[in-house]
Amino acid sequence: MYPAILELPDQILGRKVPTDWAWWMKYVGTVLASDLTPEEQFDVILLNTFREIPQNEAGHFQGVLDFYFCGDPPHGDEPAPPERLLDWKKDALRIWGDFRVYAGIDLFTARMHWWQFMSIFRSLPPESQIKNAI
């Protein structure tokens, strides 16, 4: 059993959600980085995550953002975190290469929680390809 500090969430407002890094990158990260309007992003992300538009739309959407930002969403007065400056699709090979080189993880076969992925991503060294790109 892991200590409580290492428990990874698998629910948003009591509803089970996907946790795999690739799912979050594809169905939330790319939508947030898309040219869709904020209203379209809102609906697409809710439908992707819950397969419906929940009754408490705003609360569920905020829950998705909290999950996506690993419990530490940016505040209005803070600059966007570096991961928002990249294009998950365009930068995929850089990210894959950096995970292989610096963490010994092959993202083509790896299964891990989104928060684990982001923890490793954020800890990549400044000389990594992706950190140089952003």
Predicted feature residues:
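Charged interaction scaffolds used for protein-protein
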Residues: 1-23, 30-134
